[in-house]
């Protein structure tokens, strides 16, 4: 799929996964992003580098359809942000970030933290899940080396364990695009190396989503 986007003078040929054209974000007197043009093709793996305050998190929040730019055009998985129901689009994008992690109840079991992503919610309410949902959640936890923690309360986990649970949650909906916002932040050297190794395995999987 190739779609030519035009809006406010901006033009871009949108890839299957992600396309920014002339994207800027302004908050008060601060320009968080300035005229960003960027494309991510299917199967690509990207690493975004920059100092604190450079706009990395803002960029990923837009890519996850959780923020709109001040100016410019954003294409996500063949849809144009601002013309699509974001509640239908968001489940197609996996996001692991501090903004989501801080909303996870400490008293929720690890298994529930992951399986509730099926409904795009945080914390159990009155929804029900089938065996396939639980099997997928356990499979993801196992792939990330934390299946043995499924019955533990999220609030009792170490920072490294929480990071892996967050990634499992982000993968629960089988997303077409996976966004990881500073996945190794707060980890010691050993925890960072372990997480990077597991992400490396994910990145090498030809069936895995585009990864940023």
Predicted regions and their residues:
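Hydrophobic anchor residue at the start of the ABC signature
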Residues: 167
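ABC ATPase NBD coupling module
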Residues: 80-94, 130
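Conserved ABC ATPase signature
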Residues: 128, 153-157, 161
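Helix-to-loop junction immediately C-terminal to a conserved catalytic motif
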Residues: 64
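Catalytic Walker B motif of ABC-type/P-loop ATPase nucleotide-binding domains
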Residues: 178-182
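Conserved catalytic motifs of ABC-family nucleotide-binding domains
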Residues: 174
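Conserved ABC transporter NBD signature motif
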Residues: 72-82
């Amino acid at each position: 799929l190739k779609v030519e986007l035009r809006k406010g003078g901006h033009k871009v040929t949108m890839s299957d996964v992600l396309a920014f054209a002339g994207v800027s974000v302004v908050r008060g007197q601060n320009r968080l992003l300035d005229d960003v043009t960027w494309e991510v093709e299917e199967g690509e793996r990207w690493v975004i580098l920059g100092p604190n305050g450079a706009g990395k998190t803002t960029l990923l929040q837009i890519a996850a359809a959780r923020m709109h730019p001040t100016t410019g055009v954003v294409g996500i998985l063949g849809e144009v942000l601002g013309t699509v129901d974001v509640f239908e689009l968001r489940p197609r994008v996996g996001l692991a970030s501090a903004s989501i992690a801080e909303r996870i109840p400490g008293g929720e079991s690890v298994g529930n933290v992951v399986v509730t992503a099926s409904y795009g919610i945080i914390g159990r309410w009155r929804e029900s899940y089938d065996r396939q949902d639980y099997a997928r959640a356990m499979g993801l936890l196992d792939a990330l080396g934390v299946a043995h923690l499924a019955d533990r309360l999220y609030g009792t986990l170490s920072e490294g364990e929480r990071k892996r649970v967050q990634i499992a949650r982000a993968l629960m909906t089988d997303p077409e695009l996976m966004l990881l916002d500073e996945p190794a932040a707060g980890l010691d050297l050993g925890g960072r190396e372990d997480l990077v190794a597991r992400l490396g395995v994910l990145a090498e999987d030809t069936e895995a989503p585009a990864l940023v």
